[in-house]
Structures are given as structure tokens and as C-alpha cells.
């Protein structure tokens, strides 16, 4: 009986987690979370190759597309090739894509290894970073409830426009994102 209850609780938890993955209906939550922030929080962390990174990473690019994702999220994994194409395109304009795999916060080596394998399989090689879950940036990443979620950050670390909630494979989402990117690059 005890095993059955544990199994049912696990199944319910997974069902709730996967129902949030790619859910566009909860976009209001993101407007609230990101609207309260003027800039991406300061952080110190590492990329998936072990290189030290901090918020100055944004100063290296005219615009940075920051994508929040996790390994078990199908829409997140499905959009990795699209994000790689965006990264290639943005690099020509002085921009970049950076991934934040929320499962890898605190540097969980198993999750990072699995994420790297997923990215390799999907043909994605853009930079992914992690930092302490208890940092302000970690708290922001942990507040994301629907995945994937994508935001734009300018070279001063300011969050630009509204977050794009859900996969970028649809025309509407890409058009919205491209409009925001063009607006920043035009300034």
C-alpha cells in the first residue's frame, strides 16, 4: 500500500511538472516575475565546460537571448536546433544565445552531463551556464514555472521586452522574438 501511495504521488508530481512545460497560458506569471526586474541579477557561476562566468557576460554582446530549460522538457529539447540557428545568426550581429538549465543549478554533474549529451544530439553548441540556486539569479531561474522561457538581455544587463513562454518553433513566437531582437539591435 505504501509503495502504491508513493507511486501515485510521484506520478502526480510528474504530470503536474510536464503540464507546465511549454504552457503559454501562464504567461502572466512571467510578466509579473520579469516586470519586477530591471536587470538580470548579478551572479557568479560556470559554463558547462567549467569556465567561470558572471553577469559581465552580457557586456560581450549587443544582445543576449537567455533561454531557461531543463532536460526532461520535450519542447525545450525540441527547440535546441532553433536556438543554435538563432545563436549563429545573432553572432553575426554581435549577439549570442545562453542557456540556463534549471536542473543544473548548483552544478549537478549528472544533470550537466545529460544536458551536454542532449545538446550534442540536437546539434546545439551555444553556451550554457549555471550558478548557485540560492543566489538572486538562481532564485529568478527557480521562479520560472513554464518551460521553455526565453528573455532578452542587453549589454548593460537590462531585461528587454516580454518573456517568450513556450517553444520557439512556432511562427508566432519567432515573430515576437525577432521583433524584440530587431528593436534592440536598431538602437
Give names to the regions the model predicted:
Residues 21-42, 59-60, 116-117:
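N-proximal helix/coil linker or "cap" segments that precede and/or mark the start of modular domains
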Residues 16-20:
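C-terminal motif of bacterial Sec signal peptides marking the signal peptidase cleavage site
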Residues 67-73, 102:
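Aromatic-flanked redox-active Cys/Sec active sites in thiol-based oxidoreductases
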Residues 114-151, 155, 164:
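Short, internal strand/loop/helix patches
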Amino acid at each position: 500500500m505504501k509503495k502504491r501511495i508513493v507511486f501515485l504521488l510521484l506520478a502526480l508530481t510528474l504530470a503536474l511538472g510536464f503540464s507546465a512545460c511549454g504552457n503559454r497560458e501562464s504567461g502572466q506569471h512571467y510578466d509579473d516575475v520579469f516586470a519586477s526586474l530591471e536587470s538580470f541579477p548579478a551572479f557568479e557561476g560556470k559554463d558547462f565546460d567549467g569556465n567561470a562566468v558572471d553577469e559581465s557576460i552580457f557586456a560581450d554582446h549587443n544582445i543576449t537571448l537567455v533561454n531557461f530549460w531543463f532536460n526532461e522538457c520535450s519542447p525545450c529539447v525540441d527547440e535546441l536546433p532553433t536556438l543554435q540557428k538563432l545563436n549563429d545568426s545573432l553572432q553575426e550581429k554581435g549577439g549570442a544565445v545562453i542557456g540556463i538549465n534549471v536542473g543544473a543549478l548548483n552544478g549537478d554533474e549528472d544533470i550537466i552531463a545529460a544536458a551536454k549529451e542532449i545538446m550534442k544530439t540536437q546539434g546545439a553548441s551555444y553556451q550554457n551556464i549555471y550558478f548557485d540556486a540560492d543566489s538572486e539569479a538562481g532564485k529568478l531561474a527557480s521562479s520560472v514555472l513554464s518551460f521553455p522561457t526565453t528573455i532578452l538581455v542587453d549589454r548593460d544587463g537590462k531585461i528587454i521586452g516580454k518573456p517568450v513562454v513556450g517553444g520557439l518553433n512556432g511562427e508566432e513566437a519567432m515573430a515576437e522574438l525577432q521583433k524584440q531582437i530587431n528593436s534592440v539591435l536598431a538602437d
